[in-house]
Structures are given as structure tokens and as C-alpha cells.
From Swiss-Prot:
The keyword Ribonucleoprotein applies. One of its GO terms (molecular function) is rRNA binding. One of its GO terms (cellular component) is cytosolic large ribosomal subunit. This is Large ribosomal subunit protein uL6. This protein binds to the 23S rRNA, and is important in its secondary structure. It is located near the subunit interface in the base of the L7/L12 stalk, and near the tRNA binding site of the peptidyltransferase center. One of its GO terms (biological process) is cytoplasmic translation. The keyword RNA-binding applies. Part of the 50S ribosomal subunit.
Amino acid sequence: MSRIGKLPVAVPSGVDVAIDGARVTVKGPKGTLSHTVAAPITVEKGDGVLDVKRPDDERESKALHGLTRTLVNNMVVGVTEGYEKKLEIVGVGYRVLSKGPTQLEFQLGYSHPITFNAPEGITFAVEGPTRLGVQGIDKQLVGEVAANIRKLRKPEPYKGKGVRYAGEHIRRKVGKAGK
């Protein structure tokens, strides 16, 4: 058995799980998420837990077993607690402005400001001119939006200027030697 896949997914009170064939829908206080489970894997509802089962020990089944369990667990955590990814902006004149909960305006050293709109289910929390948070219930979507914001101006290795994840260490390079 997959070490991760065989662990049951705890379903806290206030979270409703519906299994319709291969479709698992999780409804909680923060919203609703659903996922279609890959072919050989099945999800069974128990007493306050969800069990992810696989029919055989094929290589693909083993891989999908742990993956499916993690995706279902991420949905349960998302609808109860939600996810947040924090970003920092480093550089002279680099800053972010909030234009509402789903729109940001960045000044990142280009000749024009960059407007960034959040997809549905994502909100932004601007904690200062150089700090922001991306929040939502879908872990994959939160990470993707944070990566897209970071891509607007990746941290460069000489001065470290750009958008980075909070706590991210940028590998620095030594500049060219002067005369």
C-alpha cells in the first residue's frame, strides 16, 4: 500500500462530502470544491473519514493512490481553513496597490503599471506597499496565481530585485570585477 494513500482523510464536522461515481464534492464553511477521481481509484465514505482504495498493485494504481488521497485531503483543508501564499516585493520604487479585493496594480520598474486580476475564488490581501497575500480554497489555484504574480518580475540574481515568495532565498551571483 502507498504510505500516504492508506491514511484515512479526516472529515471535520461542518464539512459535507458527496461521492457521485468518480466525482468527489466537498462542501464546507468557505465554499465547495470537486474533483474527478482517476479510473482505477475509488473513494469510500466512512464514519467521519474518507478512505481512498485501489484495486491492484499496478505501478500506475500505486502512483494515483497517494495522489488522489492528497488531492482529497487538500480539498477538505481548503474548505475548512483555506490556503494563503505570501509574496514580498524587493526593489527601489517597486510596490503594489490594491484596487479592490480581486485586483492589484504593480509598479515593477517597467514604463507602465501592471494590472493583475484575480481568477474566481482568489482574493488578495495587501499588507503594505511591498507585501501581499494570495488567498483561496483551492491549493493548486492559489499556488498558480502566486507563481503568475512572481513571473511579472522574477528576482534577479545580482541585486535580488523582484517579486519573491515570503522567506524565499535567492541565490546571488558576484558582479563583474571592476578595474
